[in-house]
């Protein structure tokens, strides 16, 4: 196992334990609003602190980028740990048991290691560049769908960017006529992990942040899928507009989305 993957798994499991314990004692959870329709809890912060501490013990020189506390610049900026300590905070607050810890390691701009951990199901999704993706140690392969017929697609509503609401609904309408059904779970990290596992056939979302998808992106790629922006390019790291699935599913999704995209979403 890649040495950084070992530490990422250790950090994810420790954070997962913090999350699971607090899920059982909801009265101890303190939630606040940090932005429009965007929440944070004391549990997000506690899980993040555990992850940072675990990384720092082994790699004190590395840079860490987190959702809640921003960038912790290290002396080695070529290595970045990109962390979402609790992806699916709203689900957690509402006691809907679907959320995950997401940790990715990027070296010189390429994601090399990925972990997405679901503490409620004890499902550990891992990937190392060039070595495949796994779920609890078993090799993952994504969907073998040849087009959108019969597929289940996952998505997330653009609740932080409601200026795209009409465009988003139009895209959903276009895709829904071609696929079998949609799922909207509330955790982009798990959506991408589920694409890697073949539980859903494709995924798209508007305006994600790097910590939402950095780990999930590598899981998808290492399970035989591809990830692109809304025009089939690679600008999703900047825009957060992301489409994922096997090559044929992504091609079909992009073809259906194309005519509905505003200029802002074509970047």
Swiss-Prot record:
Signal peptide: none annotated. One of its GO terms (cellular component) is cytoplasm. It is found in: Cytoplasm. Homodimer. The rRNA transcription and antitermination complex (rrnTAC) consists of RNA polymerase (RNAP), NusA, NusB, NusE (rpsJ), NusG, SubB, ribosomal protein S4, DNA and precursor rRNA; S4 is more flexible than other subunits. It comes from Salmonella typhimurium (strain LT2 / SGSC1412 / ATCC 700720). Pfam families: Inositol_P. It catalyses: a myo-inositol phosphate + H2O = myo-inositol + phosphate. This is Nus factor SuhB. One of its GO terms (molecular function) is RNA binding. Its EC number is 3.1.3.25. Keywords: Chaperone, Cytoplasm, Hydrolase, Magnesium, Metal-binding, Ribosome biogenesis, RNA-binding, Transcription, Transcription antitermination, Transcription regulation. Its cofactor is Mg(2+). GO terms for biological process: inositol metabolic process; phosphatidylinositol phosphate biosynthetic process; ribosome biogenesis; signal transduction; transcription antitermination. The gene is suhB. Belongs to the inositol monophosphatase superfamily. Gene3D superfamilies: 3.40.190.80, Fructose-1,6-Bisphosphatase, subunit A, domain 1. It comes from the Bacteria. Part of the processive rRNA transcription and antitermination complex (rrnTAC). The complex forms an RNA-chaperone ring around the RNA exit tunnel of RNA polymerase (RNAP). It supports rapid transcription and antitermination of rRNA operons, cotranscriptional rRNA folding, and annealing of distal rRNA regions to allow correct ribosome biogenesis. This subunit may play a central role in organizing the structure. Substrate binds at residues 67, 86-89, 183, 212. Mg(2+) binds at residues 67, 84, 86.
């Amino acid at each position: 196992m890649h040495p950084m993957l070992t530490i990422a798994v250790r950090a994810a499991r420790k954070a997962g334990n913090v999350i699971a314990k607090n899920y059982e004692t909801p009265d101890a959870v303190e939630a606040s609003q940090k932005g429009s329709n965007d929440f944070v809890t004391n549990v997000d912060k506690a899980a993040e602190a555990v992850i940072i501490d675990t990384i720092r013990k082994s790699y004190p020189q590395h840079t860490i980028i987190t959702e809640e506390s921003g960038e912790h610049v290290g002396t080695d900026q070529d290595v970045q740990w990109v962390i979402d300590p609790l992806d699916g905070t709203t689900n957690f607050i509402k006691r809907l048991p679907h959320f995950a810890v997401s940790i990715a390691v990027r070296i010189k701009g390429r994601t090399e290691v990925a972990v997405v951990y679901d503490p409620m199901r004890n499902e550990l999704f891992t990937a190392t560049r060039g070595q495949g993706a796994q779920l609890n140690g078993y090799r993952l392969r994504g969907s073998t769908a040849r087009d959108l017929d019969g597929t289940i697609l996952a998505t997330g509503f653009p609740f932080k960017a409601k200026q795209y609401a009409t465009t988003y609904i139009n895209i959903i309408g276009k895709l829904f006529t071609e696929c079998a059904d949609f799922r909207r779970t509330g955790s982009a990290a798990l959506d991408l992990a589920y694409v890697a596992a073949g539980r859903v056939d494709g995924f798209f979302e508007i305006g994600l942040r790097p910590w939402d998808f950095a780990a999930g992106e590598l899981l998808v790629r290492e399970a035989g899928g591809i990830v692109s922006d809304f025009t089939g390019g690679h600008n999703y790291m900047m825009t957060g507009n992301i489409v994922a699935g096997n090559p044929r599913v992504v091609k079909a999704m992009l073809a259906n989305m194309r005519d509905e995209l505003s200029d802002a979403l074509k970047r």
